[in-house]
């Protein structure tokens, strides 16, 4: 039984919204091949409204789905390798350091793939709710491991196990890391995750019982991730790498196809928080950057919208204001997330939250914010 509070959409459990149904495609680690990205673009164009939302965990959402589209959509997604197990649809939430394996950083893709395969192979873990998240960090951050339920931080040939964002005091060979993570997740299910609560931190006693079951004990909390990925070309390497940003986390089908066309054939796209898209390039960086900017994607941190994110706004029945139309930078808040209700869906971990409490009223940091619709538009 899924926890009552778990309302996260999937490919099989579509979420009703004002603009039609919403489906979420899980991309473990934020990794997606060129062929899969082309399939996602086709699904967005054929079944949805032609747009795609990048979530805070590096997954993607199709919006505006027509009634009755779920079965055909799921079948097509499965054919593209995007839905390996219907029973584990919501369980495959894995974040990963988005630059792993690039520029001399340690690779994580095989570890993420092994973890995903182990989740899908375990019937017990089908009970994990959509809010439960695994994280795999290469030591450079970017995986939001401090906010994860079960985390693995790789250090050379070893990996540290984290529970509810805290070290469990367990360091083990990388080859044994997946087994330890799965054991911790199974313990979480046994203790009530998926039935009474959706996150380990919400269990009675938090993560201590899970850590004990895993053979460890909770220690220091992991520090939050540092700076966001910078937009634009990264330091020289092979292949060249660009980071683009989806404005307010939303991509068009044309942007999907463009980013896919630039991808190096031996590489994968990596999706990250705040709508960041890491593209290992098959072409030179200068020409690619101009094409991305011309398509409307963010390509420079100097763009005033580079630190602005938003929920789905009036497309969601909970929203009380059109925050996507109102979203703009706020002085003194370099990273700001506009939310149409108190849930604050899609907020990056490092963003300040401005919440609409009515069509023209907002809270920023819990305090009334003097913003008028005319001023914000």
Question: Predicted regions: what is each one?
Answer:
Residues 2, 21-162, 174-175, 179, ...:
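Small-residue-enriched alpha-helical segments and adjacent helix-cap loops
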Residues 69, 193, 201-226:
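Terminal amphipathic helices with adjacent charged low-complexity linkers/tails
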């Amino acid at each position: 039984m899924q926890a009552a509070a778990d309302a996260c959409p999937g490919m099989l459990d579509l979420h009703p919204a004002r603009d039609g149904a919403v489906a979420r495609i899980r991309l473990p680690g934020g990794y997606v091949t060129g062929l899969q990205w082309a399939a996602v673009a086709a699904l967005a164009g054929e079944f949805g409204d032609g747009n795609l939302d990048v979530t805070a965990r590096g997954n993607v959402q199709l919006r505006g789905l027509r009634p009755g589209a779920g079965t055909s959509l799921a079948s097509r997604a499965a054919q593209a390798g995007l839905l390996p197990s219907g029973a584990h649809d919501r369980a495959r939430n894995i974040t990963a350091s988005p630059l792993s394996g690039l520029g001399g950083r340690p690779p994580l893709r095989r570890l993420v793939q092994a973890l995903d395969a182990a989740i899908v192979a375990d019937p017990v873990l089908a009970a994990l709710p959509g809010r439960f998240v695994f994280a795999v960090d290469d030591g450079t951050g970017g995986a939001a491991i401090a906010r994860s339920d079960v985390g693995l931080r790789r250090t050379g040939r070893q990996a540290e196990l984290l529970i509810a964002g805290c070290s469990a005091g367990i360091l083990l060979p990388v080859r044994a890391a997946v087994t330890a993570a799965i054991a911790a997740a199974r313990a979480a299910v046994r203790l009530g995750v998926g039935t009474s609560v959706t996150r380990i931190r919400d269990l009675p006693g938090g993560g201590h019982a899970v850590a004990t079951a895993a053979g460890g004990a909770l220690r220091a909390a992991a520090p939050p991730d540092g700076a966001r990925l910078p937009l634009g070309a990264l330091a020289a390497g092979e292949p060249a790498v660009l980071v683009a940003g989806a404005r307010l986390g939303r991509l068009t089908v044309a942007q999907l196809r463009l980013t896919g066309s630039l991808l190096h054939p031996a590489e994968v796209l990596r999706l990250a928080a705040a709508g960041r898209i890491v593209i290992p390039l098959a072409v030179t960086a200068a020409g690619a950057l101009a094409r991305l900017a011309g398509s409307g994607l963010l390509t420079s941190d100097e763009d005033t919208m580079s630190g602005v994110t938003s929920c789905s706004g009036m497309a969601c029945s909970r929203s009380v204001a059109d925050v996507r139309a109102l979203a703009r930078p706020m002085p003194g808040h370099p990273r700001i997330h506009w939310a149409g209700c108190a849930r604050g869906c899609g907020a990056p971990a490092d963003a300040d939250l401005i919440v609409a409490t009515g069509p023209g009223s907002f809270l920023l940091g819990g305090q009334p914010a003097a913003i008028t619709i005319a001023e914000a538009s």
